[in-house]
């Protein structure tokens, strides 16, 4: 575990929000290039969902969504869980800390992942926010929505993710941010370290982090 920001002034952690792709499940680096190829988006600086939203007709938007959902369906079949997944789910459930998911994916892959890889007694999530909620990450709105529904302050919530969008959304919302490092996102610690409070390599490392944060908050 690597601490990039100080822990001073933190409150008791009452909720954790997880990204899904690359966070709860192992990274699938081929997926986003495949989506861009499917909709003819060559400019990597343009957000996929934003590109679709700006298409001129509803027919074109639907066709583009259908194409990326085919890619997501393939990815869904190949999903594998992150190391430490069950450990962190068990800890949060046992200690009454709210579990939530915020993803730019659609609902079906989330439901499939939860049923396939998380034991039923640990599989209850308070809120699952997908891309049907707008605006999506990297805007703070999805996380602020979850905090509001839970009746907690954003600073009492951790955002766990593997991407710029996750860290930007978490920081903008006022949450504590945890970057799950992998073989393709190390650049975030160099280029956007101001967005990351702590980086981990295994989801189970978050257990010790929460224990320390909640101990220090009293």
UniProtKB/Swiss-Prot annotation:
Gene Ontology MF: a single term: pyridoxal phosphatase activity
One Pfam short name: Hydrolase
Transmembrane segments: none
EC category: hydrolase
Gene Ontology CC annotation, any one: nucleus
Keywords for this protein: Cytoplasm, Hydrolase, Nucleus
Listed InterPro entries: HAD-like_sf, HAD-SF_hydro_IA, HAD_sf
Localization per record: Cytoplasm; Nucleus
Additional remarks: Present with 396 molecules/cell in log phase SD medium.
Similarity section: Belongs to the HAD-like hydrolase superfamily.
Record-given protein name: Uncharacterized hydrolase YOR131C
Organism: Saccharomyces cerevisiae (strain ATCC 204508 / S288c)
């Amino acid at each position: 575990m690597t601490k990039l920001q100080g822990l001073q002034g933190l409150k008791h952690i009452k909720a954790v929000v997880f990204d899904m792709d690359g966070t709860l499940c192992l990274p699938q680096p081929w997926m986003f290039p495949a989506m861009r190829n499917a909709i003819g988006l060559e400019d990597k600086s343009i957000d996929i969902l934003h590109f679709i939203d700006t298409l001129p007709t509803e027919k074109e938007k639907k066709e583009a969504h259908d194409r990326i959902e085919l890619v997501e369906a393939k990815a869904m079949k190949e999903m594998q869980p992150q190391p430490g997944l069950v450990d962190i789910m068990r800890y949060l459930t046992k200690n009454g800390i709210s579990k939530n998911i915020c993803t730019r994916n659609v609902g079906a892959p989330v439901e499939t992942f939860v049923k396939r890889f998380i034991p039923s007694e640990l599989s209850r999530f308070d809120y699952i926010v997908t891309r049907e909620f707008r605006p999506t990450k990297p805007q703070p709105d999805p996380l602020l929505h979850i905090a509001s529904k839970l009746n907690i302050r954003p600073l009492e919530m951790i955002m766990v993710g593997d991407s710029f969008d996750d860290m930007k959304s978490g920081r903008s919302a006022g949450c504590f941010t945890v970057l799950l490092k992998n073989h393709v996102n190390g650049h975030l610690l160099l280029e956007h370290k101001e967005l990351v409070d702590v980086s981990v390599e295994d989801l189970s490392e978050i257990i010790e982090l929460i224990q320390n944060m909640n101990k220090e908050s009293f």
